[in-house]
Amino acid sequence: MVIRMRREKPELLVPASSLEVLKTAVIFGADAVYIGGEAFGLRAKAKNFSMEDMAAGIAFAHEHGVKVYVTANILAHNDDLEGARAYFNELKEIKPDALIISDPGMFMIAKEVCPEIEIHISTQANNTNYQTYLFWWQQGARRVVSARELSLKEIAEIRKHIPDEMEIESFIHGAMCISYSGRCLLSNYFTGRDANQGACTHPCRWKYAVVEEKRPGEYLPVYENERGT
């Protein structure tokens, strides 16, 4: 198979946590904006968008030729599914340009409820190789967001093996996780708050010490530099 490369200007996609931020991003030149609603996204503690603000934001962006993508990228449990179906029915009416999804069950519901809306596969789905990209392409996804931990060399290799029409999205700025996205269980273990449900407490940013079991109370601090930990 011969894959011909298109040379197009990359899309500058930025997050927006509120209607005001969305409008600012649009005015200052974003090509697209991604936002989260009050459920099913990974920023459970953020203010997020009401359905009314989401509709207003999408309308404003479209007036300025800017696209809006809505996140629904939790790893869903059984009791999330009916709510997700209702949510996608509401989103269908306000016409976002794409849904950002990581869970195959959520993907299936979105395809059924709003087949006219593009689906992008979230970085939360651990997209680390070209076969994963091809899998999602065959399921009907147009874009896959690379795992944030991939190198430019790895992303270039993926590009060589996927259809020219398939889009790759990559983060160039933002928080990094200690683990591949979606694979960290620290928050759930320490606090009972599930990172894959949008409630991460970021325990990877806490300060830790090492204790030898026969010397309780003697804490050795942990440092990291260019030589390691």
Question: Model-predicted segments: where are they?
Answer:
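Active-site pocket-lining/capping segments in soluble small-molecule metabolic enzymes
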Residues: 2-127, 154-229
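The substrate-binding groove and active-site-proximal loops of carbohydrate-active enzymes
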Residues: 43, 142-146
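A broad detector of the eukaryotic-type serine/threonine protein kinase catalytic domain
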Residues: 96, 141-142
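Conserved nucleotide-cofactor-binding alpha/beta core module
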Residues: 130-131
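Catalytic domains of cell-wall/extracellular-matrix polysaccharide-remodeling enzymes
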Residues: 146-149, 154
